[in-house]
Amino acid sequence: MLLLFAVMLTALFEMQLPHHPYNTLPALPPTQDLETATLLKAVAQAARALGELKGVCQTLPNPALLINTIALQESKASSAIENIITTHDELYQAIVQDLDIMLASGTISPSAKEVLRYREALYEGYNELQKRNLLTTNLFIRLMQTIKQNSAGIRKESGVCIKNQMTGEIVYTPPEGEDVIRQKLYELEQFINDPPHDLNPIICMALLHYQFEAIHPFADGNGRTGRILMVLYLVQQGYLDLPILFVSAYIIKNKARYYELLRAVTEREAWQEWCLFMAKAVEETAQLTLHTIQRIRIAQDDIT
């Protein structure tokens, strides 16, 4: 009985309390066995869809058109997750005209500007990978600065917390202290670029996305930066040649479940459920991107 009480007391102290900074956030990978039969099946289906997408992209006569179209859709959806809403017409108009002139004249909204900055950050990350196939803290900062158009760096202030938008209840408090945050990011870099494991990269993509969001290194722009990192990681690992996975489409369609599972990993280490969700996101959005390519090809054929 005494032993049971001691175990329960230990578990209570180890539990992450929502209003306490999560400075004890463990480094990746998790200690539990992730490669169950169910998850490996889901990962295989996601990998198959990515392989088909990669193969089709290699046959495109004008991949730049595809990159522009998909990147714009991903930018719009990822920004919508943060309640930044705009229209495709406004975005395409800004592409063919001078964005800064349109903004100064009031002919484009600040929301559209933020969406286009996301696309710019996606391109910037992809171009950096072509030069140096590494995902680093400095790159994370550059992506956020491009999205937010500021010179902010790692979050220094304390008291940052995530609240339920409906109730105001604190649901999560990320790590505090610049040194602590930088150490967490360094550990994440090591997991990404020099992994001491043989986990499937699609599982790793799910893990690193949670970890980045849990570290919450910036005052703003964490969600969008984290979603760019997922796509860049798949490029780094050779699953994609181009940054064209429309993953935010699945997340926005399942937004409540996405945030519920992020919280579940923190509260009860629900890694299996989280990784299954993300594997399904990869599979469905790879198929969605394939359908988009088919529509682009039909449109090109009609023009020619």
Regions found by a protein language model. Give the residues of each.
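FIC/Doc superfamily catalytic core
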Residues: 1-304
